[in-house]
Amino acid sequence: MIGAWFTSLRLCSALLAAHGDEVSPARLCRAAVIVAHVADEWPPELLAAISYRESRFDPRAVNARTGTWGAMQVSTRRRGDEWAGYRAGVAKLREARRFCVRRGEGELCVLAAYASGPAGVRGRWYRGPRRVLRDAARLKSLTGRRHGAPQEVRHEA
């Protein structure tokens, strides 16, 4: 628990440096706290980068075309619960990882499957996943971690 708070402080500082001119500090730091607590096996910077690309950390964002909502742009019954939205995003990442492991693919596949669903992954990558990886690498460098590149997605057996 203490580790999550330290992570959230580092991440909040990095988010303010990276996005403080376009997103309110309160929204950035709230997102940092939630991300640090729900990240589990995922790098918090990766979840923050996804949330930034999906909604600019807006917990009330709604995509009328896809029916997704919240900072992580997911579908869940607990609409309006910001923590549940982030947890649903983590669950969606796990599902995407399982799909990509079966295909023998890595991080780009996971991010593409998160963004468009497993059915949307057709071997042709678009700019979205690469942008998320760049955002995550930038946040890692701003949090003061020694390794600046996003860590490889761990594969489950």
Please tell me what each predicted stretch does:
Residues I2-D40, F57-D58, S75-A157:
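Non-catalytic cell-wall polysaccharide-engagement segments
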Residues P44-E45, A49-N63:
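Conserved alpha-helical segments that form or flank metal/cofactor-binding pockets of metalloenzymes
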Residues A49, A71-Q73, A113:
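Structural recognition of the beta-strand scaffold that forms the well-ordered cores
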